[in-house]
């Protein structure tokens, strides 16, 4: 009998069935087990079963040991520009810029009060037939102008109220020798003398002084004191502020 390769599975299956039937028959007749048959060939794999139910959650694993830090990577491409940040603190002042061109003239301002604030002027005369006493202060008793009241006729002294540069001048009539001395706060500044004998003559002098507030100026005579003040022969003392400080 010629057996090909394709009939081997069928032949093996038949032999297996024959071996299974032989013991059953021998047991029924004699009561003894037969010799076990040879194991059959493995069957074909069965179909996959259904998925089982999820198992319980496992225990946390052991933390892994940190690995060694790798080398620095290559520089990446520049990113997109970010949003503008908040304003920082003010920086230090910069260097002065180049002066700009001159602007057009502005409107005239209001008239100032310079003249009202800084004025000092007086003119007084000596109207008496009696000359001053020797080596004494000369009092001028008649006021021609004294709007600020800086000259006091009771004391014969000018008192500075506005600091600045002043000019003082006098014209004295006399018929005998006369020397006029100008004092500043007790210190003699200048002396003017005129000499005559029984004739009317005029002695004049002037001086510029820079005064501070509270300083005083007056005229005096020495041993030559023949100053008169009569109609037609006046003696005048004047002073005024030129430039305030």
UniProtKB/Swiss-Prot annotation:
PANTHER family: COMPLEMENT C1Q SUBCOMPONENT SUBUNIT C, EMILIN ELASTIN MICROFIBRIL INTERFACE-LOCATED PROTEIN ELASTIN MICROFIBRIL INTERFACER. Changing residue 129 to A: Has no effect on binding to IgM. The modification 4-hydroxyproline is found at residues 36, 39, 42, 45, 54, 63, 81, 93, 96, 99, 105. The modification 5-hydroxylysine is found at residue 75. Core component of the complement C1 complex, a calcium-dependent complex composed of 1 molecule of the C1Q subcomplex, 2 molecules of C1R and 2 molecules of C1S. The C1Q subcomplex is composed 18 subunits: 3 chains of C1QA, C1QB, and C1QC trimerize to form 6 collagen-like triple helices connected to six globular ligand-recognition modules (C1q domain). The C1Q subcomplex is inhibited by sulfated molecules, such as triterpenoid sulfates, heparan sulfate, or chondroitin sulfates. The keyword Glycoprotein applies. It is found in: Secreted; Cell surface. O-linked glycans consist of Glc-Gal disaccharides bound to the oxygen atom of post-translationally added hydroxyl groups. Residues 45-113 are annotated as: Disordered. Residues 115-245 form the C1q domain. It comes from Homo sapiens (Human). It is linked to C1q deficiency 3: An autosomal recessive disorder caused by impaired activation of the complement classical pathway. It generally leads to severe immune complex disease characterized by recurrent skin lesions, chronic infections, an increased risk of systemic lupus erythematosus, and glomerulonephritis. The gene is C1QC. PROSITE patterns: C1Q (PS50871). Residues 54-71 have a biased composition (Low complexity). This is Complement C1q subcomponent subunit C. Glycans are attached at residue 75. Changing residue 86 to A: In LysC58; impaired ability to associate with C1R and C1S. GO terms for biological process: complement activation, classical pathway; immune response; innate immune response; negative regulation of granulocyte differentiation; negative regulation of macrophage differentiation; synapse pruning. Residues 31-112 form the Collagen-like domain. Disulfide bonds join 179-193. Keywords: Collagen, Complement pathway, Disease variant, Disulfide bond, Glycoprotein, Hydroxylation, Immunity, Innate immunity, Repeat, Secreted, Signal. Residues 90-99 have a biased composition (Pro residues). The C1q domain is the ligand-recognition domain, which specifically recognizes and binds the Fc regions of IgG or IgM immunoglobulins. GO terms for cellular component: blood microparticle; collagen trimer; collagen-containing extracellular matrix; complement component C1 complex; complement component C1q complex; extracellular region; extracellular space; extrinsic component of postsynaptic membrane. Core component of the complement C1 complex, a multiprotein complex that initiates the classical pathway of the complement system, a cascade of proteins that leads to phagocytosis and breakdown of pathogens and signaling that strengthens the adaptive immune system. Residues 1-28 form the signal peptide.
